[in-house]
Structures are given as structure tokens and as C-alpha cells.
């Protein structure tokens, strides 16, 4: 198994400096991760820094709360793609889901999917805030709206990925949709366990440490 190709090498901290982004890009080039995941302001810089590699540029939309309007999320998506983004990680409208407004949740996801064209869309359900029933509903709505992946977490709420959540999400969406575990893998063993549970992508700031077999600091 080429575990590096499961990893979205991530730096989403609001105080990230250019030199830290450059370090992220350098590590991505060296280790050949699936993607780097950065905030929208860094997309253009990341695209240039990864020229000549097969590492994708992933960015976030409606992040981290998911509480912007669908129009804003669609605009963010289009601009990110214009700037070079290959993949979009969007946050659902969590409040709408918990209020039972499933039509709004679905249309919100669909707005981003339609704005993304042929680019990959991952839907962050923020599992730590949801009941198991709500997790299932969120995954079903993401699938119905045409997204490519469901993703556990933003890394900015009360918890990250759990094995139980990844397993539930995989059982819900079946074998043909991606599942991204974010915020729970701190070691090589953690990463393998998530993959065995059904994850096809792992979002982490600790990709290098994981591949080296070291225990990473931090919780994303």
C-alpha cells in the first residue's frame, strides 16, 4: 500500500506563514502526497509550488463553520478553481441539518458541486456535532447531490475523525464514494486503521511523521 497517496498534507491554521506553506509544499514534493490542503488565499502559491508534480491542490469552502450562504460557497469554489484548485473540501450547513431542513443541506452541496465542474468535491459533515442518524443523513445528501467524497471533520470543532464514524460513513455511501478521515491520524498505525475502516483519503498535518513511523504532535 502506498500510504502517501492516501494523505492530504494539510495546513489550515489561520496564522500560517508563507515559509510554513513553502515547507508544506516541499514535503509534498518529496513524499508525493495525494494533495496539499491549504486555505484559499494560498491556492495560487501552492499551484505554482507544485508545478511538475502529480500532487493536487485542495482548498476549503464555507470553512470552518459551513454557515455562509450557498451563493457565497459557489463563488468561493469558482474562484478557488480559477486560482488553480484541483479539489474542494466544503462544509455542510450543519445548523440546517440539525434543524431538519434536508432540502437546504442538499441544495447547498449541489451548488458547490455544480460550481466545481469536473473538480473533486469532498463534503465535510462535521461528525463530532452530529448524531449517528444525522451522520447517515448527511452522507446520503452528499451522495445525492453528486459529491465525490464525504469527510469527517474540519479540525476546528470539538473532535476529529473516529474509526466508528469512518466505518459508519463507508457503510452508508457504499464502495464507490470516497471517505476522508480528518483530524484523527497521528501515527502510521492510526492511518492504517482508518484505511481498514474504509477511508480512501486521510487529512492530516502529520503526513511526514506518519510515513516515518513517528508519533505526531497536534490533533489534526
Swiss-Prot record:
Q: Which domain of life is it from?
A: Bacteria
Q: In which pathway does it act?
A: Carbohydrate degradation; 2-deoxy-D-ribose 1-phosphate degradation; D-glyceraldehyde 3-phosphate and acetaldehyde from 2-deoxy-alpha-D-ribose 1-phosphate: step 2/2
Q: Which InterPro entries match?
A: Aldolase_TIM, DeoC, DeoC/FbaB/LacD_aldolase, DeoC_typeI
Which reactions are catalysed by this chain? 2-deoxy-D-ribose 5-phosphate = D-glyceraldehyde 3-phosphate + acetaldehyde
Q: Which residues catalyse the reaction?
A: 89, 151, 180
Q: Which SUPFAM superfamilies match?
A: Aldolase
One Pfam annotation reads DeoC
Q: What does this protein do?
A: Catalyzes a reversible aldol reaction between acetaldehyde and D-glyceraldehyde 3-phosphate to generate 2-deoxy-D-ribose 5-phosphate.
Which protein, by its recorded name, is this? Deoxyribose-phosphate aldolase
Gene for this chain: deoC
